[in-house]
Amino acid sequence: MVRLGVNIDHIATLRQARGVDYPDPVEAAMMAIEAGADGITLHLREDRRHIQDDDVRNLKRKLTVPMNLEMATAEDIIQFAEEIKPEHCCLVPEKREELTTEGGLDVAGQQNTLKKVCARLAKVGIEVSLFIDPEEKQIDAAKAAGAPVIEIHTGHYANAKTDHEHNQQLKRIADAAAYADSLGLTVNAGHGLTIHNVQSIAAIPVINELNIGHSIISRGVLIGLAEAVKEMKTLIAGAQ
């Protein structure tokens, strides 16, 4: 069964929009877990635009499922992760001006740096994944960097405008997933996945986990967060 990691960043986005103390990401995480989330994902950005340090601390104390902390390779955030010790860390690229993560890490271009970060996090018991585009050279570089897990960026698939482009991007992801699996890597995926496009990705045989946030939180505004999580879980299960 493909696992569902629910990203709660945009609960914090809603809170930060008013500079108040609600809605509480911890409360949202507990609701998501009750509804069937297999893990909770959150991105501690360098600019702290949504998730704050205390959110991570509070969640780590209360979570009953694994935490997946998305993070850049900034030294202060690496040190914070070493202190908090989430079960998983996903290293992602980051630009201050972006609305959301726009693509995968160039692991091949910064392999030495990433190898050191992977080793540091692994030393304190954190399983590290690298968020990458579905390209063999990036998968090879991730393997060489010592990451046991990759997360395939599904954004180009999600943003495809035509059936041809959709099918082309889906094949890229499926081929990349199979290649990574052949190297012994665990394969996760995420970015831009919704109730309308998740099943084709969930049906890829070697996918271990999907990390989904914005679309679940958005659906939650309309139908309730618990129902939105259950809906996504049902769709993922139906794709197996």
From Swiss-Prot:
<feature type="binding site">
    <location>
        <position position="18"/>
    </location>
    <ligand>
        <name>3-amino-2-oxopropyl phosphate</name>
    </ligand>
</feature>
<feature type="binding site">
    <location>
        <position position="100"/>
    </location>
    <ligand>
        <name>1-deoxy-D-xylulose 5-phosphate</name>
    </ligand>
</feature>
<keyword id="KW-0664">Pyridoxine biosynthesis</keyword>
<keyword id="KW-0963">Cytoplasm</keyword>
<dbReference type="InterPro" id="IPR004569">
    <property type="entry name" value="PyrdxlP_synth_PdxJ"/>
</dbReference>
<feature type="binding site">
    <location>
        <begin position="213"/>
        <end position="214"/>
    </location>
    <ligand>
        <name>3-amino-2-oxopropyl phosphate</name>
    </ligand>
</feature>
<feature type="binding site">
    <location>
        <position position="45"/>
    </location>
    <ligand>
        <name>1-deoxy-D-xylulose 5-phosphate</name>
    </ligand>
</feature>
<dbReference type="GO" id="GO:0008615">
    <property type="term" value="P:pyridoxine biosynthetic process"/>
</dbReference>
<dbReference type="Pfam" id="PF03740">
    <property type="entry name" value="PdxJ"/>
</dbReference>
<comment type="function">
    <text>Catalyzes the complicated ring closure reaction between the two acyclic compounds 1-deoxy-D-xylulose-5-phosphate (DXP) and 3-amino-2-oxopropyl phosphate (1-amino-acetone-3-phosphate or AAP) to form pyridoxine 5'-phosphate (PNP) and inorganic phosphate.</text>
</comment>
<feature type="active site" description="Proton acceptor">
    <location>
        <position position="70"/>
    </location>
</feature>
<dbReference type="GO" id="GO:0033856">
    <property type="term" value="F:pyridoxine 5'-phosphate synthase activity"/>
</dbReference>
<comment type="pathway">
    <text>Cofactor biosynthesis; pyridoxine 5'-phosphate biosynthesis; pyridoxine 5'-phosphate from D-erythrose 4-phosphate: step 5/5.</text>
</comment>
<dbReference type="InterPro" id="IPR013785">
    <property type="entry name" value="Aldolase_TIM"/>
</dbReference>
<dbReference type="InterPro" id="IPR036130">
    <property type="entry name" value="Pyridoxine-5'_phos_synth"/>
</dbReference>
<feature type="active site" description="Proton donor">
    <location>
        <position position="191"/>
    </location>
</feature>
<dbReference type="GO" id="GO:0005829">
    <property type="term" value="C:cytosol"/>
</dbReference>
<feature type="binding site">
    <location>
        <begin position="9"/>
        <end position="10"/>
    </location>
    <ligand>
        <name>1-deoxy-D-xylulose 5-phosphate</name>
    </ligand>
</feature>
<protein>
    <recommendedName>
        <fullName>Pyridoxine 5'-phosphate synthase</fullName>
        <ecNumber>2.6.99.2</ecNumber>
    </recommendedName>
</protein>
<feature type="site" description="Transition state stabilizer">
    <location>
        <position position="151"/>
    </location>
</feature>
<feature type="active site" description="Proton acceptor">
    <location>
        <position position="43"/>
    </location>
</feature>
<feature type="binding site">
    <location>
        <position position="7"/>
    </location>
    <ligand>
        <name>3-amino-2-oxopropyl phosphate</name>
    </ligand>
</feature>
<comment type="subunit">
    <text>Homooctamer; tetramer of dimers.</text>
</comment>
<keyword id="KW-0808">Transferase</keyword>
<comment type="similarity">
    <text>Belongs to the PNP synthase family.</text>
</comment>
<feature type="binding site">
    <location>
        <position position="192"/>
    </location>
    <ligand>
        <name>3-amino-2-oxopropyl phosphate</name>
    </ligand>
</feature>
<feature type="binding site">
    <location>
        <position position="50"/>
    </location>
    <ligand>
        <name>1-deoxy-D-xylulose 5-phosphate</name>
    </ligand>
</feature>
